[in-house]
């Protein structure tokens, strides 16, 4: 989605009146441009100064979060992962210019079965090739954060009211595209476990908005390669540095970090660490609920959703997140699938839902809306934030569209 280089004039056979209108009347040009996707707008921005200014104004009006998802229907082709193919096609028609992208894909096909059995060099090459292919589809200035997990939760493209799908096994993925939103700052962060230096400097946390930031509202946090020695303790150490603030904290443990374009050095697929996104801005409202082990049928799941509904988070311009344990899902609900995602849809009919099945969950019951906080972070013990055999459901509202 890069701007095309310079201009190209209008053909001499063009109607002179049309040429005059499209070269001089900004209102008309802007109206025409509202029908074009972002990629086409970036191409025509190089034609002349008038068109460039019109493109800038039109893109400023496109501020809604967009998503691209790939599920069972898109899987099964031999030419690469389904998410790469679907993103390449869908970006031709996306109307926003993404500034930050969060994508998640299933581990089994993003990293092939043969490579998972121990061919480390092949695994590293394949993982990075797939991740690089995906990253190259987005603008160079776009910050891309990508992780791979055992299972994926996606809402099909087209409408936020589409039925979300819990895909516990199989090729799948999604990409959340965040444009630049007035009054909201989204920052990726990454802390790599270094056995020689486990100290987290205050400036590292401040630079990514996790400390000394009165507008911090939400942190999505993910520990990767947590099966390795010391990795889980490192995740606890990182989270403890900002968990006592009045913010929403949600996430979990995933298999691997596959993309982080803001990093200067190539990612080491065998490293362990903590990665995520911080959301800052007074317009943000958010809430989370924890579905504990005793939430094990449709009735108790719906009771949890009622608690989330009671937070009264606006549904417009809101994203739902579901971070579940791999031990839940189909087998946990006595061979009944999609129980939690369906319950979410029942109570939030127009909010798209995304997430994963992972190896541990982070979060608790909490509401952050304006100056009101239910169950302040400093009232929650650290062990109450880390769970297994649970699900974290979260709502993140990014302000009313202007």
Curated annotation (Swiss-Prot):
GO terms in the biological process aspect are: cellular response to starvation; nucleocytoplasmic transport; positive regulation of proteasomal ubiquitin-dependent protein catabolic process; positive regulation of ubiquitin-dependent protein catabolic process; proteasome-mediated ubiquitin-dependent protein catabolic process; protein polyubiquitination; regulation of myotube differentiation; regulation of skeletal muscle fiber development
Q: Which residues carry this modification: N6-acetyllysine?
A: 193
* Functional note: Substrate-recognition component of the SCF (SKP1-CUL1-F-box protein)-type E3 ubiquitin ligase complex. Promotes the proteasome-dependent degradation of key sarcomeric proteins, such as alpha-actinin (ACTN2) and filamin-C (FLNC), essential for maintenance of normal contractile function. Substrate-recognition component of the SCF (SKP1-CUL1-F-box protein)-type E3 ubiquitin ligase complex that is implicated in the control of various cellular processes such as cell cycle control, transcriptional regulation, DNA damage repair, and apoptosis. Promotes the proteasome-dependent degradation of key sarcomeric proteins, such as alpha-actinin (ACTN2) and filamin-C (FLNC), essential for maintenance of normal contractile function. Acts as a key regulator of histone methylation marks namely H3K9 and H3K36 methylation through the regulation of histone demethylase KDM4A protein levels.
A Pfam family cross-referenced in the UniProt record is F-box-like
Which residue stretches, if any, does this entry annotate as coiled coil? none
**Keywords assigned by UniProt, alphabetized:** Acetylation, Cytoplasm, Ubl conjugation pathway
Underlying gene: Fbxo22
Specify the species. Answer: Mus musculus (Mouse)
Taxon lineage: Eukaryota, Metazoa, Chordata, Craniata, Vertebrata
How does a null allele present? Answer: Fbxo22-deletion mice are almost half the size at 6 months of age as compared with WT mice due to the accumulation of TP53. Other mutant mice died within 2 days of birth.
What's the protein called, per UniProt?
Answer: F-box only protein 22
Q: What InterPro entries does the record point to?
A: F-box-like_dom_sf, F-box_dom, FIST_C
């Amino acid at each position: 989605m890069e701007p095309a280089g310079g201009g190209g004039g209008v053909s001499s056979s063009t109607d002179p009146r049309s040429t005059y209108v499209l070269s001089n009347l900004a209102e008309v040009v802007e109206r025409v441009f509202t029908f074009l996707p972002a990629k086409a707008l970036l191409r025509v921005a190089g034609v002349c100064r008038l068109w460039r200014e019109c493109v800038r104004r039109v893109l400023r009006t496109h501020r809604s979060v967009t998503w691209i998802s790939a599920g069972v229907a898109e899987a099964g082709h031999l030419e690469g992962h389904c998410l790469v193919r679907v993103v390449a096609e869908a970006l031709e028609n996306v109307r926003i210019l993404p500034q930050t992208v969060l994508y998640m894909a299933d581990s089994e096909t993003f990293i092939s079965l043969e490579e998972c059995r121990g061919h480390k060099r092949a695994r590293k090459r394949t993982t990075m090739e797939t991740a690089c292919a995906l990253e190259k589809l987005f603008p160079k200035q776009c910050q891309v954060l990508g992780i791979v997990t055992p299972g994926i939760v996606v809402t099909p493209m087209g409408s936020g009211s589409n039925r979300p799908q819990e895909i516990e096994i199989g090729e799948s993925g999604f990409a959340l595209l965040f444009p630049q939103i007035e009054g909201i700052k989204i920052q990726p962060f990454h802390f790599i476990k270094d056995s020689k230096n486990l100290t987290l400097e205050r400036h590292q946390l401040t630079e990514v908005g996790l400390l000394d930031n009165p507008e911090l509202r939400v942190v999505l946090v993910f520990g990767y390669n947590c099966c390795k020695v010391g990795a889980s303790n490192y995740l606890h150490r990182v989270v403890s540095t900002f968990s006592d603030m009045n913010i929403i904290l949600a996430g979990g443990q995933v298999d691997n970090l596959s993309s982080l374009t803001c990093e200067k050095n190539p990612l080491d697929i065998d490293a362990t660490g903590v990665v995520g996104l911080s959301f800052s801005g007074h317009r943000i409202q958010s809430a989370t609920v924890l579905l504990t082990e005793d939430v094990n049928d449709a009735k108790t799941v719906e009771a949890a959703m009622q608690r989330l509904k009671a937070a009264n988070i606006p549904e417009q311009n809101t994203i739902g997140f579901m971070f579940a344990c791999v031990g839940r899902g189909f087998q946990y609900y006595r061979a009944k699938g999609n129980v939690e995602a369906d319950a979410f849809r029942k109570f939030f009919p127009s909010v798209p839902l995304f997430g994963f099945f992972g190896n541990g969950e982070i979060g608790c019951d909490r509401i952050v809306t304006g100056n009101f906080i239910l169950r302040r972070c400093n009232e929650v013990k650290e062990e109450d934030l880390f769970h297994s055999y649970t699900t974290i459901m979260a709502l993140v509202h990014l302000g009313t569209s202007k």
